[in-house]
Amino acid sequence: SWLDILVLHAAGFCRFVSKADIKDWPVIGMMATHAGTLYIARDSRRDALRVVHHMRDALQRGEVVAVFPEGTTSDGLTLLPFHANLIQAAISAESPVLPVALEFIDSRSGQMSTAPMYIGDQTLIESVWRTLTTPGLRAVVSYGEPQSPEGRERREWAAELRESVAALRTTTGAG
């Protein structure tokens, strides 16, 4: 959701890779741009290659770069397959990857909340309003152990990282 970037940035500074549309969103786009977000045209293979090069350069400079390897938004109840393309940047930069799980929890029930979801026909305003008016909404960020890129192939590593993130999820387990 749109809230993922804000929560993860609050938990620790990082640059994000995000779909190009976000830079045109009111307020959130401006904040994402000022945070150094790398924008990607998701339907362009050439643009993915460009972003991988920028990510590699940022990682080699010691910057922290965050990606959403599912490549799309969902209701958050299940974990979608991870795309491997952007993981190549960590392999090329010889940079470890830190698996991170982000969940929105209804603190009253302890269950996963779908309040912040922004999918389908919903508008951004509807999602923001629902998030702001949901009582007891709590963001939980869980960190795994850093994983070295040494000897990794990006597709296999993407599947392993997905398993690591699934294990970090507190409300849904393997997702």
Predicted region positions:
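Conserved ATPase "switch" residues in P-loop NTPase domains
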Residues: 59
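Aromatic/hydrophobic pocket-lining residues that form π-stacking "cages" and hydrophobic walls in ligand
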Residues: 54-55, 86
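Short active-site segment of divalent metal-dependent hydrolases/proteases
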Residues: 73-74
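A cross-family acyltransferase "interaction/gating" segment
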Residues: 27-30, 44, 77-156, 160
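Generic beta-sheet signal
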Residues: 63-69
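C-terminal alpha-helix
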Residues: 163-171
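Catalytic core of membrane glycerolipid acyltransferases/transacylases, capturing the structured
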Residues: 1-45, 109
